A protein has these predicted regions:
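N-terminal regions that are enriched for targeting/export leaders
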Residues: 10-92
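Extended alpha-helical coiled-coil/bundle linker/stalk regions that scaffold oligomerization
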Residues: 258-259
Length: 261
């Protein structure tokens, strides 16, 4: 990270602090935390906007970190196979847990919220690939929720997208239709679909719906980002090309440099 970028971020945070009643000493402390977080994020492109948004979120007395987690899809060698759906500890939760524990070491006042992606069960094509009904999907997600509660630190909160953000699934479907129809997004969707093609083929999505599925993923990231930015929170996410949609939403986020596909 170039030194001039850090200087510009610090000046921006100092201005934010002056206008929002943040004591000057907290700016220096936040800058130290930002450097620590950057060292944890792996090889992602980190710019001034990313750092500024994250710094502003860290000024909160109790920063909320929302952690979206896929259901307990089958996996092998640390990568999802999507052969079936189980009701135990999800792979992504297991990969996020050590990252979050490290984050808490220098952010002891942070509030961790695990968000199980129960809304993914609303995709008929995904349920068909997993050979499960909607009822079974939801039941297994609840089983995973209980398993995480038993496994994680007691002060972490474990919930689902539907519980935390009522109406999230419907809103995401509506946004997906808008994104899919917008000409300005066509090239971006095509590029993201190309990156995700191996994943789609693993699930069994026909090529004719792959771009549409990418629009739905983009909408989920946008909708989550907009919800979290409203509470000045932070999102913790795995490595994925879809992180760019968080930038569109204006939300602060950190990348746990793990791959699951």
């Amino acid at each position: 990270m170039r030194r001039d970028v850090w200087k510009r971020v610090q000046r921006g945070l100092e201005q934010y602090a002056r206008t929002n009643g943040v004591i000057p000493q907290q700016v220096n402390a936040t800058m130290r935390v930002l450097r620590r977080i950057v060292s944890m994020c792996g090889s992602m492109v980190i710019g001034r906007r990313f750092l500024y948004r994250l710094g502003c979120a860290l000024f909160e007395r109790t920063p909320y970190v929302f952690v979206p987690v896929c259901p307990d899809y089958s996996y092998e060698d640390g990568k999802y196979t999507y052969k079936d759906l189980r009701n135990g500890l999800p792979l992504l939760y297991l990969k996020h847990k050590p990252f979050l524990l490290e984050l808490e070491q220098f952010l002891p006042n942070v509030k961790i919220i695990i968000l199980l992606a129960d809304h993914e069960g609303d995709l008929p094509e995904l349920r068909a690939a997993l050979n499960v009904s909607l009822e079974t999907f939801r039941t297994n997600v609840e089983g995973s929720k209980d398993a995480i509660v038993d496994d994680c630190p007691a002060h972490w909160r474990v919930t689902t997208f539907s519980e935390q953000f009522p109406g999230f699934s419907q809103h995401a479907f509506e946004r997906a239709n808008e994104i899919f129809r917008e000409k300005k997004y066509q090239r971006r969707l095509a590029q993201d679909t190309s990156v995700r093609r191996e994943l789609y083929e693993k699930i069994g999505y026909h090529h004719s719906i792959q771009c549409e599925r990418t629009a739905h993923v983009a909408a989920q990231y946008l909708c989550l980002g907009e919800q979290v930015v409203n509470v000045h929170g932070i999102i913790c996410n795995h490595m994925t090309t879809s992180l760019s949609w968080y930038m569109d939403a204006g939300v602060a986020f950190v990348q746990n440099p793990v791959k699951i596909y």
